[in-house]
Amino acid sequence: MTPVVLDAGAALHLLALPDPSPASELMLRAPRLLRSEVLSALHAQVWRGAVPVDAALTMLRRLDGLSITLFADEHLLHERAWAIADQLGWAKTYDAEYVALAQLLDVPLLTVDGRLARGVERLIGVLAPADLGR
């Protein structure tokens, strides 16, 4: 099994798959922020009319079914995320929490965000869902 830090975009990608079996080959790790970001993104998709309520709630329940270890040492994580956001010139620290956790665990970040991937590839390893199973 491959350990990875999963960001919210990658989590949503896996949850939308008819068969999220690629996730079963991964040891998924994430900051606790992941759950709130996924909840918010699903709610926004419903609010915009892009996804039916039932589908969003199903994906939210599927999140509970994914075996994700959420890391709670927020003091250490937040300090590292703050430093990363400063280093990369980011005003917000949301993405920096995922990057910080990947650094702390010395594992790659799984993301669908190409801009994020390009911005942090000099700091950590980065994978896209298409890289799984290769």
Where are each of the predicted segments found?
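Residue-level signal for well-ordered alpha-helical positions
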Residues: 17-18, 41, 122-123
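Acidic, PIN/NYN-like endoribonuclease modules and their adjacent C-terminal/linker elements
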Residues: 3, 31, 35, 99-134
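Active-site neighborhoods of divalent-metal-dependent phosphate/nucleic-acid chemistry enzymes
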Residues: 68-115
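Active-site-proximal, substrate-binding regions of enzyme catalytic domains
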Residues: 33-71, 77-81
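Short, well-structured N-terminal submotif of metal-dependent ribonuclease cores
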Residues: 1-34, 45, 50-57, 133-134
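Glycine/charged-rich beta-loop-alpha catalytic/anionic-binding loops adjacent to active sites
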Residues: 19-24, 63, 82-83
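Buried hydrophobic packing segments
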Residues: 11, 38-42, 101
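Phosphate- and divalent-cation-binding pockets in alpha/beta enzyme and binding domains
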Residues: 14, 37, 80, 118-119
